[in-house]
A protein has these predicted regions:
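N-terminal cap/lid segment of alpha/beta-hydrolase-fold proteins
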Residues: 1-27
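Short, surface-exposed "cap/lid" segments of acyl-processing enzymes
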Residues: 25-61
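Structural cue for short, hydrophobic secondary-structure segments
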Residues: 32-37, 71, 95, 190
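Catalytic nucleophile-loop/oxyanion-hole region of alpha/beta-hydrolase
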Residues: 49-54, 58, 68-108, 239-240
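Primarily recognizes the serine-hydrolase "nucleophile elbow" in alpha/beta-hydrolase
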Residues: 91-159, 171
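Acidic beta-to-alpha connecting loop that harbors the catalytic carboxylate
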Residues: 116, 194-197, 228-230
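The feature captures the conserved acid-bearing segment of alpha/beta-hydrolase catalytic domains
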Residues: 135-143, 148-161, 166-205, 209
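C-terminal catalytic histidine-bearing segment of alpha/beta-hydrolase fold enzymes
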Residues: 205, 213-257
Length: 257
């Protein structure tokens, strides 16, 4: 494995706008652009690293199975406001699409994330304007992984507006608002835990139901229900063979395309 750290994906080179590239030991590979979770918030500024990033969990599993993983940092509250984190996510995807061929033969481009990263992924997929600003049709992405993302307006976006963050609102800041008929959506993996955070399971079911109601090819929806787990908890555990559970779920989807 080869690790390339702190590559800035905008000309502004703001402290939060960088990515780390984890390359497998092969010349051809699919690429998974991963957007981390955390409620779109960051308590402390990103500190300068004194040691290389530790690669473990799903990232290690994917790289060991021939998938390049790009780990994206982006602006968060309290130093950002809507929609800056979505704009950053789009910039990162555009950088990867333009530059990853410099590192090997790219066989597919997947975009995904967990929790807040799942929300960002949904916004990139369903609201065409964000990737469109970079000349990218979101339907040209090989596949999307929406891991426990909120398809309604994100609770911290509501908080920014001074609205009770428990409310369920679907407006232009909600991925669901942009789901429509007539698009040939790429394959998407949608993941939710049995004991996920309040309302996340129900909102996920509404997203899936809406996609189907609007005529989305159901064979492109890879729904994964994670029994017994809490919100994104499955990323921390290994199976009986010692393999990261989330890594296997991601790889099962990526390897199909």
């Amino acid at each position: 494995m080869k690790l390339i750290e702190k590559v800035f994906y905008t000309n502004a080179k703001l402290p939060e706008q960088f990515l780390d590239i984890c390359l497998p030991d092969c010349d051809s590979f699919p690429v998974y652009v991963y957007l981390h979770g955390g409620g779109l918030t960051r308590k402390d500024p990103i500190a300068e690293r004194t040691e290389p990033r530790k690669i473990s969990g799903f990232t290690e599993y994917l790289v060991n199975h021939g998938v390049a993983v790009v780990l994206v940092e982006y602006r968060c509250y309290p130093d950002a406001c809507y929609p800056e984190f979505i704009l950053d996510a789009a910039y990162a995807v555009a950088w990867v699409k333009e530059h990853m061929s410099e590192y090997g033969n790219v066989t597919g481009l997947f975009v995904g994330g967990a929790s807040a990263g799942g929300y960002l992924t949904q916004m990139l997929c369903f609201d065409k304007k964000y990737l469109g600003k970079h000349g990218i049709d979101p339907d040209s992405i090989t596949g999307y992984i929406m891991d426990a993302g909120q398809p309604t307006t994100h609770f911290n976006v509501l908080k920014e507006r001074g609205i009770d963050s428990r409310r369920v609102i679907v407006d232009e800041a909600a991925p669901l608002y942009h789901v429509c008929a007539g698009r040939d959506y790429p394959p998407m993996q949608i993941i939710v835990a049995e004991n996920d955070m309040r309302n996340r399971f129900e909102q996920t079911q509404l997203l899936i139901s809406t996609l189907k109601h609007l005529g989305t090819d159901e064979s492109k929806i890879d729904y994964r229900f994670m029994p017994g787990y809490k919100h994104c908890e499955y990323g921390k555990y290994a199976d009986e063979n010692g393999d990261n559970i989330l890594g296997k779920v991601y790889y099962d989807f990526i390897s199909k395309f």
